[in-house]
């Protein structure tokens, strides 16, 4: 059940994941334009987001020990995790998929 707070107060794990991804994209754009100083600034910001995400995943509230597929797919797709976290998230995602009979449960993936 969604409330107004779901839109007004972003989930920190989602906001951090997408911020890291956007900063990586901006770094690529600046690099392609020949603006290496700006590209490096974006890459550094993205690296900080990844470290923040890794720390967030070590907390109980945002643990990778979940059946929530989005919480496992985002960090894997965006390369946000440390090696051990990545290995755990991959195994945990397989477990989550088995638990849901291999149904994709992420809302944005089901939309047309």
State the predicted function of each range.
Residues 1-112:
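Active-site core of glycosidic bond-cleaving carbohydrate-active enzymes
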